[in-house]
Amino acid sequence: RRQRQMCIRDSYRMYHVKNSPGVWEVELQSGAIKHGDLYKLKVRWNGGEGERIPAWANRVVQDEQTKIFSAQVWEPENPYRFRKKVFRAKTDPLMIYECHIGMAQEEERVGTYNEFREKILPRIAEAGYNCIQIMAIQEHPYYGSFGYHVSSFFAPSSRFGTPDELKELIDTAHRMGIAVIMDIVHSHAVKNEVEGLGNFAGDPNQYFYPGGRREHPAWDSLCFDYGKNEVIHFLLSNCKYWMDEF
């Protein structure tokens, strides 16, 4: 085991769970962290240490001044509740409209989940489409990658809005009879170490292939090692999370 100590920003020390490789836990008092709070892990390993965003963080935001990414607690007092409980897509035929949330507007700026829901969905429905395929929206540090250099796999990109606003977009699409396909990226990940998984706990190959198979030449990114049970668990859990939560 490379990681020797893990804590939440020096404040709350985590402890390794006996007989559970790679599993660390911490018990916090009620109210210790609340909705909107920023947090990171501080990981110490043999020969070094670093602040890391938890791999399972479901909300990540970027400071407008420093440009630093941090995980954020997302537990709103009144979370969004889906109005359309059951949805069955019409597939005869399935007419798919591929879209990018940030580019789906006419001004020179990044669009939002709310703008897409209010302005674009009605036009898509009017054009006769019954399905949208949303290009990659998992959190990514570089907007120019179109979302394909993912750093936080469980977090919808905060540059487009909040998780609840994405839920409302999807719910609205379903109520309009429009199915939603999400383009998730599990073939590779961004190289970034501070924001991503590139060197999460002192082992640059924790999630990825070693040697010549590690880097994706076309994307300048890292390739997941599908031969590791922990990696498969991480990626399949990610699929389940998006299906269950959104």
Say what each PLM segment does.
Residues Q3-I8:
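Short, small-residue-biased leader/transition segments that mark boundaries at the very start
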Residues D10, D37, H149:
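Residue-level signal for beta-strand positions within conserved beta-sheet cores that form or flank
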Residues D10-S11, R83:
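Short structured motifs
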Residues S11-N19:
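Short, surface-exposed loop motifs enriched in S/T, G, D/E and P with embedded aromatic residues
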Residues K18-E98, M103-E108, E115:
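The feature marks proteins involved in alpha-glucan
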Residues V61, P79, R83-T91, H100-F246:
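Substrate-binding/active-site clefts of carbohydrate-active enzymes
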